[in-house]
């Protein structure tokens, strides 16, 4: 299934058992590839996502309570209230405007507000890095301790430049609104360790539903093991990756040695 399948058969996917549960949560995609998709999550899924976010956040250098700046397009269906911003100790930074003045204001806020964690679109963080380099800004007065790119693949040279500028690790999350945080980039290379306890992953060939060979670029297909309100089974989310299986302590774990964005944005043979 894919997003179009969910949109066309939306009511049939919703679990009758969980449909009207008062503690459900509705997550919305940004709609960058079409109409936003509303995804219902049950209480246990929400709790599992929260626990996963805490664990993978700490692994990336972000801890609960840190001042966080989140750089993305803040459309109405994801915009946070003033209470939520206080509760989460967060600053919203809008990436829909990234001219020199906007970047200067962004850097000033990061420095003045003593932001400790930067989360944002990879492209927006790249533009901020480029602005710092061109303007000769001094990052030594900044308090940033962790940078977490999301949504797009960050080129390795940009990642290493950001690490040098702010003197902190830059490790991307692999995540989406439908499922949550699904993996964390390795510290020393571009690969990802993915959460195989919460999700079952398949890497299928680009032009068929046969499993891709190890080391072959393929489509990511996800089964969410915890969302009972809106079962996500064999979901082709449009992303592509090269996967390898590694043995550790008698168990084989799946790693993504290369991760790319939406298939519609790629050219391949």
Roles of regions detected by a PLM:
Residues 1-28, 34-50, 54-65, 74, ...:
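Nucleotide 5′-phosphate-binding alpha/beta core
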Residues 36, 76-78, 227-230:
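Short, acidic Gly/Pro/Ser/Thr-rich loop/turn segments
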Residues 54-97:
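Conserved AMP-binding loop of ANL adenylate-forming enzymes
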Residues 87-269:
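Active-site glycine/GP-rich loop and adjacent strand/helix microenvironment
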Residues 19-20, 29, 164, 225:
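Short hydrophobic/aromatic segments of transmembrane alpha-helices and their interfaces
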Residues 27-28, 83, 256-259:
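Short, flexible, solvent-exposed loop/turn segments with mixed acidic/basic and small polar residues
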